[in-house]
Design a protein with these regions (language model features):
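Conserved donor-binding/catalytic core segment of Leloir-type glycosyltransferases
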Residues: 196-212, 218-221
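Aromatic "clamp/platform" in nucleotide-sugar-dependent glycosyltransferases that forms part
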Residues: 263, 282
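Glycosyltransferase donor-sugar binding loop
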Residues: 51-52, 173, 205, 232-245
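A short, well-ordered alpha-helix in the C-terminal region of glycosyltransferases
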Residues: 191, 328, 335, 342-356, ...
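Conserved acidic donor-binding segment of nucleotide-sugar-dependent glycosyltransferases
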Residues: 314-315, 319-326, 335-340
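Short hydrophobic beta-strand element within catalytic cores of glycosyltransferases
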Residues: 299-302, 312
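A short helix/loop element that forms part of the nucleotide-sugar donor recognition site in Leloir-type
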Residues: 179-195, 366
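Carbohydrate-associated surface elements
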Residues: 150, 172
Length: 388
């Protein structure tokens, strides 16, 4: 199978925007990882995306992935020309998000009798079928993938999509890379950062923006520090300059108990140093950082929102609390930090849940089957793995 994978942005050519935000989006991470997983399974994959900068190449190979950047203002026309010439062997389409040029791929697929699958990885991407002509085209795909039950409900209620077309399937993570550390490994990692082996460590890893609940984090950590001066906070991620400044100020005001680490290439060591993950985000799909933390053995305190409620079950894999309620976050974080046995039990349950329903070894074959199906084949794979 030669799969055309369409995504709005991919390898845009700059690591950070002018205001400090990393330019690589969750959709881009998923596109890259899914392409690699599909290639491992013997499929050819071409990623079609926007060309945003003059200096980026129109076509190149990146890690074995054929990447084509489409030129403005005629991306749809260029896409159709390529599908009839340089990429005429494409016989299946996989769309992540709702890039405008993808409507031409959908129409082309229908004309040729090829399957087309659309995956939404965020609540904000849900479309209203009758809103405009593009939305009407997006509502005609062969199959749909929702990474959460909230997105599935949005497909049905707003997009008018038949339930039998919708598969609820995690985007997946590499559980062979995100692993629980040994006692010795955790001790060594902490020593490298000057953190006591006996300290209780809270971890936050996400973009430093308001939507991720950084303002709530700024409120909850002083509460935790006041109750447990020996606890430590690791803040991993780059983002808005003003919020980064406020985090550094908070670290000083809490006696240096918080480490503001900025953007890192590889977050695993920071998960492995931790005891509890905290995630006060305002809205999510299926949070990758939460999956990574859980796979690394951390129970979590999270906002009670879509996506998080597909992963965190109170008293079993962590706790859900009301969004923006800093006091509730602090209370549950302190409860977990002070309960070694409960923390260990919930961490083990978190690892088991992620391995059961979110590992690439579980997800990728199901993804490939949906993409190549010419008939509706919806199934709730997430629900099937939820026994905690």
């Amino acid at each position: 199978m030669h799969i055309a994978l369409l995504v709005k942005d991919f390898a845009v050519g700059e690591k950070f925007s002018k205001d400090g935000l990393p330019t690589k989006s969750g959709a881009e991470f998923h596109a890259e990882n899914h392409a690699k997983e599909l290639i491992k399974r013997g499929h050819r994959v071409t990623i079609f995306t926007r060309k945003r900068h003059f200096y980026t190449k129109s076509r190149e190979s990146m890690g074995g992935i054929d990447l084509v950047r489409l030129h403005e203002p005629s991306r749809g026309t260029e896409l159709l020309v390529r599908l009839m010439t340089t990429h005429k062997t494409v016989d299946a389409f996989y769309i992540i998000g709702t890039p405008k040029f993808a409507v031409w791929a959908i129409r082309f697929a229908h004309a040729r009798g090829f399957p087309v699958t659309l995956a939404l990885t965020g609540k904000a991407e849900i479309f209203d079928a009758g809103k405009n002509w593009r939305s009407r085209v997006f509502s005609t795909c062969t199959n749909y993938i929702a990474t959460t039950h909230e997105i599935r409900d949005g497909y049905i209620q707003r997009g008018g999509i038949a339930p039998e077309k919708i598969s609820v399937l995690a985007h997946g993570i590499d559980t062979e890379r995100y692993v629980v550390p040994t006692v010795e490994e955790k001790k060594r990692l902490r020593e490298e950062q000057g953190i006591s082996p006996d300290a209780r460590v809270l971890v936050f890893c996400a973009r430093i923006v308001r939507d991720k609940g950084v303002d709530t984090l700024l409120k909850l950590w002083p509460m935790v520090h006041a109750a447990d001066a020996g606890a430590r906070l690791l803040v991993v991620g780059g983002g808005k300059h003003e919020l980064m400044r406020r985090l550094h100020e908070m670290a000083k005001e809490t006696d240096g108990s918080a480490r503001i680490l900025g953007e890192v290439d590889w977050p695993l060591p920071y998960y492995q140093m931790g005891d509890v993950y905290v995630f006060p985000s305002r809205h999510e799909a299926l949070p990758t950082s939460l999956l990574e933390a859980m796979a690394s053995g951390l129970p979590a305190v999270v906002s009670d929102i879509g996506g998080c409620n597909d992963l965190i079950f109170d008293g079993r894999t962590g706790y859900r609390v009301p969004t923006e309620d800093a006091a509730a976050f602090a209370e549950k974080a302190l409860q977990l930090l002070g309960d070694d046995a409960g923390r260990r039990r919930m961490g083990e349950a978190a690892v088991a849940l992620v391995h059961r329903m979110c590992a690439y070894s579980v997800v990728s074959d199901k993804l490939a089957a949906v993409i190549q199906s010419k008939e509706p084949c919806g199934k709730d794979f997430l629900l099937a793995g939820m026994e905690v």
